[in-house]
Amino acid sequence: MDWKGRDVISIRDFSKEDIEIVLSTAERLEKELKEKGQLEYARGKILATLFFEPSTRTRLSFESAMHRLGGAVIGFAEASTSSVKKGESLADTIKTVEQYSDVIVIRHPKEGAARLAAEVAEIPVINAGDGSNQHPTQTLLDLYTIRKEFGKIDGLKIGLLGDLKYGRTVHSLAEALAYYDVELYLISPELLRMPRHIVEELREKGVTVYETSDLMSVIGELDVLYVTRIQKERFPDEQEYLKVRGSYQVNLQVLSKAKETLKVMHPLPRVDEIHPEVDKTKHAIYFKQVFNGIPVRMALLGLVLGVI
């Protein structure tokens, strides 16, 4: 497939071959970056970051990636600083911003907003998260992190813990892992189970899926534990949130039952679902995940711009 001009909206739009191209390109760029410190592939290109919803890691990671490729960045970090506050439609915002840029990265609270942006734009659009729907670039950096740590993805037992209902990171990750020979453990309160259609699709694709609310019953089986916060902002009813708040905390007591080789991941930000005492253990790789976002997003930007 020709990558130049391609949109990155959903992990569902990716074949396994596409994923492997991104991961191998990221690996190459990470090596080049360590050798040279600064690359020039995107010199003369401009990235527009349109963040209608708060972000620290994703926005700064994309901006860092573009700068490290030699490009420039424009954009806004919250909708209140844009003309959307004056009533401008998303479509008009996109059509305007594309006049100033070569690629757009968008985060929006409404599901489907990134797809709409891609439909109206004539330049590539990358989804940095649309509501509780998809977060494809987070998924790619998660896969990259797993592969770097284990040298493979196939054959692993991977647990997804926490808010599996509203968590867009785990929706995208579960769908991508269906391309690999893995066993998935879905660990959540009953109220926050993975959407049924995703579980059914995983099983139809031959993935072995276990569902439980009891972390301790499976912690000893896992190679990877992917932890998510319970996302208060996604709940339609605060009472529903209060019922599940603080359902899990990964701490040293929990990890004492785990394999020595278990790796704990988290898309961040965290609240209290991973105790800070875990940070200094050999299990914790969530800050490595943060770094890995840079080469992965460099790869995506370079590919859709057609410069690498």
From Swiss-Prot:
InterPro entries given in the database record: Asp/Orn_carbamoyltranf_P-bd (IPR006132), Asp/Orn_carbamoylTrfase (IPR006130), Asp/Orn_carbamoylTrfase_sf (IPR036901), Asp_carbamoyltransf (IPR002082), Asp_carbamoyltransf_Asp/Orn-bd (IPR006131)
Sites where the protein binds L-aspartate: 86, 168, 229
UniProt GO molecular function: amino acid binding; aspartate carbamoyltransferase activity
Reactions mediated catalytically: carbamoyl phosphate + L-aspartate = N-carbamoyl-L-aspartate + phosphate + H(+)
Keywords of this entry: Pyrimidine biosynthesis, Transferase
Quaternary structure note: Heterooligomer of catalytic and regulatory chains.
Family: Belongs to the aspartate/ornithine carbamoyltransferase superfamily. ATCase family.
PANTHER family per record: ASPARTATE CARBAMOYLTRANSFERASE, ORNITHINE CARBAMOYLTRANSFERASE, MITOCHONDRIAL
Protein name: Aspartate carbamoyltransferase catalytic subunit
